[in-house]
Amino acid sequence: MVKISDNSEIYDLIKDVTYLLGISIIEINTFRKRDEFKIQIVLYKSDNFSVDMLCDLHKMILLKLEAVLKYNVSLEISTPGINRKIKSDREFKIFEGKKIKLMLNNDFEEGFILRAERDGFIFKTEYKKVKILYSNVKKAKLS
């Protein structure tokens, strides 16, 4: 299978459905093999995100995708999980208020994302509150 890097078409097709339900699209991965199209979507909602809601979303999104795409579609929807690696600056905004493990130099430090900004975020530990630039983050994951 070949991984496809531009997922903007998929994002544009599903963003209205997720936005109305207060759900953030964290990640979209697409793979194509001949006439088969495999799509993996990671979604996040801060509260009341049940398995039933995921099942309903799967049905709605799959119908939209099958109506537009010219391939057989295999769809996998999941949530980020409790130890998700934060992969983009955009995710700091999505996970505001959440506890994370952050590596700046060679040590991990635990704290909370208080507020995400354009170039960084406010990180609060037990002893300090500091602005961290996204460019200084080596690793970050939910904790």
UniProtKB/Swiss-Prot annotation:
<comment type="function">
    <text>Required for maturation of 30S ribosomal subunits.</text>
</comment>
<keyword id="KW-0963">Cytoplasm</keyword>
<dbReference type="InterPro" id="IPR028989">
    <property type="entry name" value="RimP_N"/>
</dbReference>
<dbReference type="InterPro" id="IPR036847">
    <property type="entry name" value="RimP_C_sf"/>
</dbReference>
<dbReference type="GO" id="GO:0005829">
    <property type="term" value="C:cytosol"/>
</dbReference>
<dbReference type="GO" id="GO:0006412">
    <property type="term" value="P:translation"/>
</dbReference>
<protein>
    <recommendedName>
        <fullName>Ribosome maturation factor RimP</fullName>
    </recommendedName>
</protein>
<dbReference type="InterPro" id="IPR035956">
    <property type="entry name" value="RimP_N_sf"/>
</dbReference>
<keyword id="KW-0690">Ribosome biogenesis</keyword>
<comment type="similarity">
    <text>Belongs to the RimP family.</text>
</comment>
<dbReference type="GO" id="GO:0000028">
    <property type="term" value="P:ribosomal small subunit assembly"/>
</dbReference>
<dbReference type="InterPro" id="IPR003728">
    <property type="entry name" value="Ribosome_maturation_RimP"/>
</dbReference>
<dbReference type="Pfam" id="PF02576">
    <property type="entry name" value="RimP_N"/>
</dbReference>
